[in-house]
Amino acid sequence: PLRRQRQMCIRDRTNLVLANMKGFSNGPFLDKDRIEQAGNDNVSALKIKTPSLNEVVGQLSGGNQQKVVIGKWVNTDADIFIFDEPTRGIDVGAKIEVYRVMNDLVKAGKCVIMVSSELPEILAMSDHVVVMRGGRVMADIDRDTPHFNSEDIMKAAWGGELD
């Protein structure tokens, strides 16, 4: 997300389960053991580099902060995940981990929608591209069509018609 700093308001391991608090509560109380287990699982699965689960998220690198935000949502039972500029401002290693998480979600039968301004990323990660301009759909392109290329996607983004 573009505003990952704002989305990390909780300072400890609770942050990793924030989007699914019902799944980690026992009546009105949080199940700290389950939260800790989920935190350990996320740190391991997402390869989050942190000295402890209680580390202030803002002290982590940008890539690790991004993985915490993603981990929060992976803990939900959602079928659709929207990634808005998921790799902006993070290093190559963290990008690879984010891509892996997205691919794992797809393999698990989840729908992943990625919004990105990085065209190579879109071409590498997408099976289907919808190009929008000014709130209007300019093109709807499947990977197996001849229009699934940088030139045609940019043409549509600038308002041009595809043949």
PLM region spans:
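Short alpha-helical
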Residues: 1, 120, 148
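Single conserved hydrophobic/aromatic residue that forms the stacking wall/gate
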Residues: 1-6, 10
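Amphipathic alpha-helical interaction/coupling elements
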Residues: 5, 15, 38, 152-157
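Helical hairpin unit composed of two closely spaced alpha helices linked by a short loop
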Residues: 12-138
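Conserved beta-strand-loop-alpha-helix hinge in the C-terminal portion
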Residues: 25-26, 136-162
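A short, hydrophobic secondary-structure junction motif
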Residues: 40, 162-163
